[in-house]
């Protein structure tokens, strides 16, 4: 490969891919292009920065230059890719262009901000860069509204509460983690957050935000309003697909790829939060790690289809941590729940009596790996 491999992006997926490629080939030309600084940080740490009094710069693990030297790369930080000419195998920015043999899109996903009046007052915490932009406001804020009671919203609510802030957590659904599990399973976390002092506004929808002398007024569709100092959008992520569209490759929710992580164009691949693998968007660390292993082989001439085993998803709420696996969101499962003072085991059983999903908490999390082995997938 005389022109080599270009990777657009510098997050976890891009870095895992680089490491896996270099394990197999020390010399193939590798180029990374990204809009950020390309310094490495651990994104899950963003769920705990406030209680741990961390500044954005404290999250940096490795500078971009060190990474480039360690893995023999060409890096182009702070560079916006404007277009991809898939037929000519060329990536273009405003003032540069690069030729490639193979191209990998690792463009990640952007935080979704609800399209309401005053949406510009909402903050997002989806990157080190976003946290850097609002860290002073968040540290100084005493009253915080978090919009979205999913994985990230629940983690942030606990973290801000542990930091001594007055926290309101709002969601359209009737329970927390509603897209991941039924209310009878998430209720343990819900009760714990309430006991900590988090004010839950469930079955509630935000209508508008307005700047006031005292801070920000958040008005609900019900016309109930609350005064806060900061509002965080934790309403999910949207895969970044704009570049893929410009390149002419197939896009659905994410960039559509097959089991080989290949898009509809034979020399363009996608990995990480931007990828939709056989119809599934999997923005979790373990599938990204496995994707990087398989994609590295395939970029270097292999032909190995990605096989994803049953995997754990971790909810990083330190005072009541949860692990879950399987089809926890299925509505036709019968849940067997054992809840004791040291934790909970919830098993989602099919009509045929097969274990199709489970959620474990606290000290019962040590049973997760044994349950994984018996999970029907």
Curated annotation (Swiss-Prot):
Where, per UniProt, does this protein localize? Cytoplasm
What pathway or pathways are given for this protein in its record?
Nitrogen metabolism; nitric oxide reduction
Q: Does the keyword Cytoplasm apply?
A: yes
Q: Which InterPro entries match?
A: FAD-bd_OxRdtase, FAD/NAD-bd_sf, FAD/NAD-binding_dom, NO_rdtase_NorW, Rbx-bd
Q: Which UniProt keywords apply?
A: Cytoplasm, FAD, Flavoprotein, NAD, Oxidoreductase
Q: Which reaction does it catalyse?
A: 2 reduced [nitric oxide reductase rubredoxin domain] + NAD(+) + H(+) = 2 oxidized [nitric oxide reductase rubredoxin domain] + NADH
Main localization of the protein described in the UniProt heading? cytoplasm
Give one GO term, molecular function aspect: oxidoreductase activity, acting on iron-sulfur proteins as donors, NAD or NADP as acceptor
EC number(s) stated in the UniProt entry for this protein:
1.18.1.-
**What stretches pass through the bilayer?**
none
Tell me which cofactor or cofactors this protein depends on: FAD
Output the Gene Ontology cellular-component terms.
cytoplasm
For whether the record's keyword set contains Oxidoreductase, the answer is yes
Q: Specify the superkingdom.
A: Bacteria
| Record function comment | One of at least two accessory proteins for anaerobic nitric oxide (NO) reductase. Reduces the rubredoxin moiety of NO reductase.
- Family, similarity comment: Belongs to the FAD-dependent oxidoreductase family.
Provide the protein name.
Nitric oxide reductase FlRd-NAD(+) reductase
Q: Organism source for this protein?
A: Salmonella enteritidis PT4 (strain P125109)
Name the gene: norW
């Amino acid at each position: 490969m005389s022109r080599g491999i270009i990777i657009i992006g510098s997050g976890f997926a891009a870095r895992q891919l680089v490491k896996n490629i270099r394990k197999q080939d020390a010399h193939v030309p590798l180029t990374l292009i990204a809009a950020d600084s390309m310094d490495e940080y651990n994104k899950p740490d963003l769920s705990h920065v406030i209680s741990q009094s961390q500044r954005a710069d404290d999250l940096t693990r490795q500078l971009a230059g060190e990474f480039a030297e360690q893995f023999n790369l060409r890096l182009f930080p702070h560079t916006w890719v404007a277009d991809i000419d898939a037929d000519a195998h060329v990536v273009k920015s405003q003032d540069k262009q690069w030729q490639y043999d193979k191209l990998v899109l690792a463009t990640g996903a952007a935080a979704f901000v609800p399209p309401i009046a005053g949406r510009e007052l909402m903050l997002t915490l989806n990157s080190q860069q976003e946290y850097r932009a609002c860290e002073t406001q968040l540290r100084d804020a005493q009253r915080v509204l978090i919009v979205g009671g999913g994985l990230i919203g629940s983690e942030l609510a606990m973290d801000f509460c542990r930091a001594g802030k007055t926290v309101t957590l709002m969601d359209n659904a009737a329970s927390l983690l509603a897209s991941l599990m039924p209310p009878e399973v998430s209720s343990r976390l819900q009760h714990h957050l309430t006991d900590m002092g988090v004010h839950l506004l469930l079955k509630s929808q935000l209508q508008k935000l307005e700047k006031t002398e005292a801070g920000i007024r958040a008005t609900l569709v019900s016309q109930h309003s609350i005064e806060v100092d900061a509002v965080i959008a934790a309403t999910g992520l949207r895969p970044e697909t704009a570049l893929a569209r410009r390149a002419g490759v197939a896009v659905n929710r994410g960039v559509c790829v097959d089991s080989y992580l290949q898009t509809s164009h034979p020399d363009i691949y996608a990995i990480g939060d931007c990828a939709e693998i056989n119809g599934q968007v999997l923005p979790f660390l373990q599938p990204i790690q496995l994707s990087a292993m398989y994609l590295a082989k395939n970029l270097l001439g292999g032909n190995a289809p990605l096989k994803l085993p049953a995997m754990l998803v971790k909810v990083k709420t330190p005072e009541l941590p949860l692990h879950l696996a399987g089809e926890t969101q299925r509505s036709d499962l019968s849940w067997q729940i054992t809840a004791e003072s040291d934790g909970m085991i919830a098993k989602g059983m099919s009509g045929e009596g097969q274990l199709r999903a489970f959620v474990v908490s606290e000290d019962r999390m040590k049973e997760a790996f044994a349950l994984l082995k018996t999970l029907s997938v």
